[in-house]
A protein has these predicted regions:
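Hydrophobic alpha-helical segments
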Residues: 1-348
Length: 348
């Protein structure tokens, strides 16, 4: 596993220099170079990606000849780089980050550095935006975050991208708050210790780090609702309405309206179609063996929100994917959000 400090250094370099240098490195993760062992990059241990990836590992190993090595990472943006280099065969990423990477837009790390080798395998479940705080901070709306100390997620992560998008939507820029960058588990510790006022945490509920925090510390979750939610939805069609059910976390008894993106499995175009088809069938023919987000993961919805071209191996399982792909509109900070929709058939 890459250490947090080393990973942060790598991501800082990526953001500063783009991915051009990284793409010239040939990795060793692709299955055809590794026999039957596949590398699967997940996310932090306090989120949903890591435990779900380990459930996928069990299902795949029980139903194919492959063995799976699951690696904890900084999640979406870092995982895109791993797929591009060939260091990972499969990875979990957000569908909005996949779109930005494939099109070379949206965030600084990808500007002008389109990752055209990125391919989709399947979408999975809503990645719910949690804005977690403590009741004593008095933070009740997104607008109240101005002037606060906020953990926006690991540097370069999809969580950080979403956090800055949402804050910018209500007129809060990085000059208007003190930003901290750490994993979900570290963010929970910071909230518990009073070192930050709020944290953005993006993932399928319930998130382990927040569940654990709520057992020892009073928490509240900030609503993204009303006009604010409409502004966020208008800023990017890759956001969708969502809700955290009351009782998901101790002490949070009422439903919390919010927004979400979509979790997806991605791969590299160079991975063989047979390998991708075998892994995909193993997962989607054995969803009854899953316990995490199992209600959302099905063959019927596996192409919902697919934002990049589908790998031929996945197309053999699901058929062609005709999706609505966004077109970009640049914002004041240089990040691109999406205001238009263009139909794209993602078949290759």
């Amino acid at each position: 596993m890459v250490g947090d400090n080393n990973r942060r250094d790598v991501l800082k370099g990526t953001a500063a220099a783009g991915l051009a240098g990284l793409l010239g490195v040939t990795g060793t993760g692709l299955a055809q170079d590794q026999g039957q062992r596949l590398s699967w990059h997940a996310g932090g241990t306090g989120g949903t990606y890591f435990p779900l990836s380990n459930e996928f590992k069990t299902v795949i190993e029980e139903n194919t000849d492959f063995t799976i090595q699951v690696q904890s990472t900084g999640a979406s943006v870092e995982n895109v780089g791993s797929l591009a280099r060939g260091d990972a065969d499969f990875a979990l990423i957000q569908n909005d980050i996949a779109f930005f990477a494939y099109n070379g837009t949206g965030i600084e790390a990808f500007q002008g550095e389109a990752i055209e080798s990125l391919r989709g395998v399947a979408t999975l479940y809503p990645e719910t935006i949690h804005v977690v705080t403590r009741p004593e901070t008095g933070i009740e709306t997104i607008e109240d975050l101005e002037g606060a100390t906020i953990n926006t997620g690991d540097l370069g992560s999809g969580t950080q991208v979403n956090a800055l998008q949402i804050l910018e939507t209500v007129g809060i820029t990085t000059d208007d708050f003190e930003e901290q960058n750490a994993s979900f588990a570290q963010a929970a510790d910071q909230l518990r210790d009073g070192d930050i006022d709020a944290a953005f945490v993006v993932g399928g509920w319930p998130l382990g780090a927040i569940e654990e925090l709520a057992t020892t510390t009073d928490i509240s979750i900030v609503e993204i609702s009303g006009d604010t939610r409409e502004q966020v939805l208008d800023a990017s069609p890759l956001f969708a309405e969502d809700e955290i059910p009351g009782g998901t976390y101790s002490g949070v008894d009422e439903d919390v309206p919010t927004v979400s993106v979509q979790a997806m499995i991605a791969t590299n175009q160079d991975l063989s179609a047979d390998t991708v088809e075998s892994v995909t069938r193993a997962i989607f023919e054995n969803t009854d063996a899953l316990t995490i987000k199992a209600d959302f993961i099905s063959e019927d919805t596996a192409l919902d929100g697919m934002s990049i071209p589908l790998h031929p191996g996945a197309r053999a399982v699901f058929g062609p994917a005709t999706t609505e792909a966004p077109t970009g509109n640049e914002t004041d900070t240089g990040n691109e959000t999406d205001t238009g929709m263009t139909e794209t058939t993602t078949e290759s």
